[in-house]
Amino acid sequence: MVIVSRYAQGAKSYDDDAITAFGNKLFTTSISLLHGFHYTDAMVIYRIYSTKLIKELDLDKDESYETEEKLFGTNISWEPLLSIRAAKRGLKIAEIPGDEPARDGGERKLQVLRWGAAYMYQNIREIFVWK
């Protein structure tokens, strides 16, 4: 899997504010420490991977998300879980620097507290489940 990192050397996110920058740093650091791969951007959507990886890592199964989604009343994306499970499997992972442009109109739909709680719960839960 190749990740286009907003925080790798020379790259910048022009869409981040103080809260999202802090959250990305917090989750990327915790995923790196808990699951064994040093990421610079474990949350980003910009990635290249084989579609068979989705099935290999059970990302296509509702049970991979349903506990967090029910507990915190929100839908979450698979990018953090993809980062976690790829690291746990010891898969080839590379990061390349890439800028994230500023948001071009529209409103951010970020649910900071719900998503933050759901992703942290998922991150910790993955220590004990899905081998």
Short names for language-model regions:
Residues 65-82:
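Acidic donor-binding loop at a coil-to-helix junction in glycosyltransferase catalytic cores
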Residues 23, 27, 79-84:
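A general structural signal for well-ordered alpha-helical segments in protein cores
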Residues 127-131:
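A charged, well-structured terminal subsegment
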Residues 1-70, 103-111, 120, 124:
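Acceptor/aglycone-binding surface of glycosyltransferases and processive sugar-polymer synthases
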Residues 85-88, 118, 122:
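Charged/polar positions on well-ordered alpha helices
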Residues 37, 60-61, 80-101:
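Catalytic donor-sugar/metal-binding loop of nucleotide-sugar-dependent glycosyltransferases
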Residues 6-7, 76, 98:
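Histidine-centered beta-alpha loop that forms part of the nucleotide-sugar donor binding/catalytic region
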